[in-house]
Amino acid sequence: MSTHGWPVRSLAAQLRLPSGPAGLLVARRLNRNNREMVLAAVEATGAVPGERVADVGFGGGSGLALLLARVLPGGQVRGVEVSRTMVMRAKVLLRRPIARGSLTIELGTATALPFAAAALDALITVNTVYFLPHLEPAFGECARVLRPGGRLVICLGDPVEMADMPVTAHGFLLRPVSDVQRALTAAGLALDGHRRAGQPPFSFHVLTAHRP
C-alpha cells in the first residue's frame, strides 16, 4: 500500500482526531483492533472497587467500560478525549453509568487535564503518545493529577513494527520506548515495569509508573 494515497492520509487523520461519520466508524475499529492493548492497560492498573481512575484519550471507549467493571461499586471512572465526536459517542453509549455518577466524560487534552491535583488513583492512556509533540508536559500533567502512589499505565505499539505501517508516515511520532521511559522519569514519575506483549506485526509495550 502506498504511503501517499488519500485513503491512507485520511485514515491517519482520523486516528489522530476522529471526527464526523468517518470518526464513528474509526471508533468501532479502535475498539476491535486495540482490545488486547486496552485489556492489558486496565489489568496493569491493579484498580479495585472504590478507586478513582481515568482513561485519557479513550477513543472508542472500550477502556471506560472495563475500568468501570474494576472500580464499582464505590469507584468512579473519568474519560478525557480531544475528539468531540468521541465524547458525544461515549455520552450516548455510556449514558447509564454517567446518570448514576460513576462515569464522567470530558473534552480535554493530555497537557491540560480537567482534574484537580491528586484526584486519581490510576490513569491509563493507550495509543496516544504518537500524537504528542512533547511527552514531558503530558506526563507531568499525569503526575499532577495522580495521588502519591497513584499508578500510570501507558500502552504503545512497538515503534519498529509501526514504522512499516503506511498510515504512520502521516503525523505519527514513533519514538523508541527508552525515550518514553526517560520522559516519564523527567516528569517526576517512578518507573515500575516494562512488558512487551502481543505478536508481530502488532506487538506492543506496557509501561507502568507511579507518582512517588
Could you say what each language-model-derived stretch is?
Residues 197-212:
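Core SAM-dependent methyltransferase catalytic element
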Residues 111-123:
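A short acidic, Gly/Pro-enriched loop at the edge of an enzyme's catalytic core
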Residues 151-181:
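Conserved class I S-adenosyl-L-methionine
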Residues 121-135:
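A short SAM/SAH-binding and catalytic strip from SAM-dependent methyltransferases
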Residues 50, 73-74, 146-151:
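Short glycine-dipeptide loop
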Residues 32-51:
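Conserved alpha-helix/loop element of class I SAM-dependent methyltransferases that forms part
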Residues 136-148:
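A short glycine-rich, Lys/Arg-flanked "PGG" loop and its adjoining helix->strand segment in the class I
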Residues 52-112:
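Class I SAM-dependent methyltransferase SAM/SAH-binding core
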